Structures are given as structure tokens and as C-alpha cells.
Amino acid sequence: MSKVTVFGTGSFGTALANVLAENGHQVLMWGKNETTINEINEQHINSKYLKTAELNEDIEATLDIETAVAFADIYLMALPTKAMREVAQTIDSLLSSKKTFIHVAKGIENDTYKRVSEMLEDSISPKHNAGIGVLSGPSHAEEVVIKQPTTVAASSKSESVRQLTQDLFMNDYLRVYTNEDLVGVELGGALKNIIAVASGVISGMGFGDNAKAALMTRGLAEISRLGEKLGANPITFLGLGGIGDLIVTCTSTHSRNYTLGYKLGEGKSLDTALNEMNMVVEGVYTTKSVYHLSKEVNVDMPITTALYKVLFENRPVDESVKDLMGRGKKAE
């Protein structure tokens, strides 16, 4: 059995910490919220993110990052994309040996437009980096933590990291496939959040199944276009890290991206919607990154562009729908 430090005490990090503990691994979680840390240690719950779900009693948690760094040789990086670089740099400053980093973030960094594995490569010295991977796919934390059947993909440039990730997490309710296409798996996880926000918007506006089906299909098309341009295998987007994640995020009220979009579709402002949710919504930050990235690499992404204008230029949602439906005639 392995020792694993989970950096982050959000919903998915907590659910995966529970999987690891259930699989017999020693788990230490690190976070900054003292109330959450105390809850995990004393009550074996994380009420902020997973309500009353009972956690494995062997999971421990700490506020002290030095303790967290020293605990294990395997790190699960379960942090928002915008926090990843800073925490990784802090970890690197405390290391004296190589560690394996597995992340579960689904975003693209603002300004640099880098994927999370690239951010980690930037932040972790080669002398401290034993390998970087990602675990991604259709996996709501709320279902994983209560052991409902879930299937995901583990990807890395390193075959040994892919195998390690599969071995760590796979059990009778969490099935893990390996996938060599790190670029595609990361991009699929990040870009589907954009489409999920847009899916929430059209639901909030009262549109039906026809509109949602079209949005998801054309959303997958623009995800694939950008992915191919950036070196991904287009087949990846037909797998768990692509269409699998897209379906679950665009159709479920568990999805914070969908929920945010729904509030926007009802006519609420971005600030109001975010304040009501009081959670990180990766799709907002990813839309900003990908809008600018698509211009830089000259890839047509009309849904991303329309959502960017809603989020950051205050364009009314009904006008953005007209923009999309009124585009010039094209072949599919």
C-alpha cells in the first residue's frame, strides 16, 4: 500500500481521498480551511463540499504544508487551476527528493494558456519530479464518495505514472482506463467546462433538448478543432476524457459550471451568480483563457466566443444565441 498526500480539500479531492483510503492507502489531506480540516479529522465529513457523506475514518488532514509534503512520495493535486502554480512552487521549495504528481484540475491557466501538467512542469524542479499525470473523466464527486459506479481515464507521458494511477484508484466502483494522450485528456476536461456553462445558459433560458443536443455536438466539434491544433489525438475526445465528461457536465445539476450557466440564463449577472454559489467555477476562467488562445492559434470557436462575450463583455444571453444561430451557412 502507498502513502498519498492530497493537496486540496474540495469536493473531488475529498472524494478521491476517500477512494484511496478505502483501497487501503494511507492518506493525508492538506488545506487552508481550519473548519474543514477539523471536520475531516474529528467528524469524518466535509460539510462544505460533500454535505453529510461519511468519509473513511483513516483519512487525516493538516493545515501544515511541511507536514503534508513530508508525508508521502505521491501527491494528488486537487486544487483549482488558478491556485496550482503557487502551491506547486511552495511544495517544490520544501522538497529534497523526487515525487510523483497526479492532478485532477480541469482548466487552462490565464495569461500563459498552459495546461495543468505544463504548469506543474514549470513549477517542480526536474530533481524533484518523478512524473506528472492526470485523472479525468465523467466523475461527479457526489457520486464517487457514495461509491456509485464511475469510470475515468488516467493519462501521463510516463507509462509508469499511468499504471501507478490506475493501480492506486481502481476498485469495484471506480474503473480506471489508461490513455497515452495527455494533451487530449487534459484539454477535454478543461474545454468541456466552457460548453457546460453554455448548456446551463440555454436551460436557464428555457430552451429544450434540441438546443442542448446541438450545443453539445457543436461544442465537441470546436473542442476537437482546438485539441488537434494543440497536438491532441482527436479520438481522445470520443472517450471518457472528452464526450464522457462533456455529457455528465452538461446534463447534471451536480455540475457547478452548468449551475452557473443556468443562473446566467435566468438573467443574473456573473458576479451575482458566483456570489450565490460561493465556489470555484473553472469554466469561467477557462473561457477567458481559451477565447484568447483560439485567436492566437486561429481556431474557430463560436460557442466559446459567444460565452466569452456574455461573461466578460456583458452581452445579453439572448443576443448571444442570435449570434450563434445567425452565423453564415456552412457544411457540417
UniProtKB/Swiss-Prot annotation:
Q: What the protein does?
A: Catalyzes the reduction of the glycolytic intermediate dihydroxyacetone phosphate (DHAP) to sn-glycerol 3-phosphate (G3P), the key precursor for phospholipid synthesis.
The organism's taxonomic lineage, starting at the top: Bacteria, Bacillati, Bacillota, Bacilli, Bacillales
| Ligand binding (NADPH) | S11, F12, K32, K106, A141, R256, V280, E282
Gene name of the record: gpsA
> Which GO terms of type biological process are on file?
carbohydrate metabolic process; glycerol-3-phosphate biosynthetic process; glycerol-3-phosphate catabolic process; glycerophospholipid metabolic process; phospholipid biosynthetic process
Which GO cellular component term is one of those annotated? cytosol
Keywords in alphabetical order:
Cytoplasm, Lipid biosynthesis, Lipid metabolism, NAD, NADP, Nucleotide-binding, Oxidoreductase, Phospholipid biosynthesis, Phospholipid metabolism
**Cross-referenced Gene3D superfamilies:** N-(1-d-carboxylethyl)-l-norvaline Dehydrogenase, domain 2 (1.10.1040.10), NAD(P)-binding Rossmann-like Domain (3.40.50.720)
Any idea what this protein is called? Glycerol-3-phosphate dehydrogenase [NAD(P)+]
Q: Which Pfam families match?
A: NAD_Gly3P_dh_C, NAD_Gly3P_dh_N
Give residues annotated as binding sn-glycerol 3-phosphate: K106, G137, S139, K192, D245, S255, R256, N257
Top-level EC class as recorded in UniProt: oxidoreductase
Q: In which pathway does it act?
A: Membrane lipid metabolism; glycerophospholipid metabolism
NCBIfam families according to UniProt: PRK00094.1-2, PRK00094.1-3, PRK00094.1-4
Q: Name one GO molecular function term.
A: NAD binding
Q: Where does this protein come from, organism-wise?
A: Staphylococcus saprophyticus subsp. saprophyticus (strain ATCC 15305 / DSM 20229 / NCIMB 8711 / NCTC 7292 / S-41)
